[in-house]
C-alpha cells in the first residue's frame, strides 16, 4: 500500500490539520441524538494516517468510541434540517 510505504519512510507523522486542532480535548460534546460525550484525544489510524476522534460516553457504561474526524465534525440532516453531528457544550 502506497500510504503505508510513505509512512514507513517518514520519521514523524505529518502535523494534525487545523480542523483536528480545533477539537477540544477533555471537552463535552452532545451528539445530535442528545447523548453527551467527552473527547479523550485526536489520534491517527496506524495504516492510513487518517485523523480520528476518540471519545467516551458520559452515560451507561462509559464506553469508548472512535470516529473519523470528518464524520465527527460533519453536519447531518434530520427532518430536512441540518445539524452538527456533535456540538461542543463545554
Predicted region positions:
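Mixed-charge, low-complexity intrinsically disordered regions
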Residues: 1-90
Amino acid at each position: 500500500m502506497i500510504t503505508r510505504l510513505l509512512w514507513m519512510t517518514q520519521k514523524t507523522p505529518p502535523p494534525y490539520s487545523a480542523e483536528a486542532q480545533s477539537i477540544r480535548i477533555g471537552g463535552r460534546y452532545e451528539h445530535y441524538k442528545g447523548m453527551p460525550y467527552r473527547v479523550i484525544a485526536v489520534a491517527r489510524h496506524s495504516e492510513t494516517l487518517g485523523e480520528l476522534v476518540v471519545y467516551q460516553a458520559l452515560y451507561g457504561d462509559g464506553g469508548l468510541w472512535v470516529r473519523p474526524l470528518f464524520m465527527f465534525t460533519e453536519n447531518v440532516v434530520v427532518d430536512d434540517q441540518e445539524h452538527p453531528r456533535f456540538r461542543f457544550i463545554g
